[in-house]
Structure formats: structure tokens, C-alpha cells
Amino acid sequence: MSSFLGKWKLSETHNFDAVMSKLGVSWPIRQMGNTVTPTVTFTMDGDTMTMLTESTFKNLSVTFKFGEEFDEKTSDGRNVKSVVTKDSESKITQTQKDAKNTTVIVREIVGDTMKTTVTVDDVTAIRNYKRL
């Protein structure tokens, strides 16, 4: 999992507003979500990974073990049950579930880019992060 470790800055995003809309995120929060460029930092302590997301809007930290469900509060305020699986050394999949939706977030390292694909039902967004 060393390919994920370190800091990543959002460099480009496609269709994120549509995903937020599908999740029922309010218009003002969607506007903020469309303008911020978060930095994501991954660290490992044994078999536990922490993902810290920092932006001018909000800072969030989630700590998890692969394959174990945990409670998570999303940046838009939803409470979800989440699980992260390790697909390979360079690819992880996070599944978030609440009463209404299932969100699948695939993060894959390709060179110095972390390609993040966010899917809710039939709506998909791509968010690319560059290694800092």
C-alpha cells in the first residue's frame, strides 16, 4: 500500500456535481464542493490506514482496516457505513452505504496520479489527484 502513502492534491474533476446531486446534496454545499481543491494524505500504522482530507471547506479524517466496516461522516454530513478493500497494491475500493444510496469510490495509483472514480447508481465522476 506504499503507493498511496503521502499527500495528493486534487488536480481535475469531471461530473462531480452530478454525483453530489444524485446523493441529495444541497445546492449551496454542491457549489462549495465544486470549488474546493482538497489535499488527501494517506498514512499507515501497522494494518491500519488513515485518510486525512483537508480543504478550505472542511477537514475529515477516517481510520480503517481493510475489509472491516466502520462508521463514517461524509463531507456533506451524511452518516454512512463504509468498508475499504485492497484490490491490489495500487488500487483500493471504498463502499459507503446509507439509507438511500450506495456510493462506490475506486482509488487507483497510476504513476504520480491517483485516479478516483466515484459512482452512485448510474452516475459517475472522475477526480484526479497529483502527488505532492
From Swiss-Prot:
**Known Pfam families for this protein?**
Lipocalin
Asked whether the keyword Transport is assigned, the reply is: yes
What happens when you mutate residue 99 to S?
Answer: In variants C, D, E, F and H
Q: Name one GO molecular function term.
A: lipid binding
Q: What is this protein called?
A: Fatty acid-binding protein
Give the UniProt keywords, A-Z. Cytoplasm, Lipid-binding, Transport
Its job:
May play a role in the transport of fatty acids. Binds to various fatty acids but not retinoids.
* Top-level taxon of the source organism: Eukaryota
Impact noted for substituting residue 131 to Q: In variants C, D and E
Q: Which residues bind (9Z)-octadecenoate?
A: 107, 127-129
Q: What is the effect of changing residue 28 to A?
A: In variants C, D, E, F and H
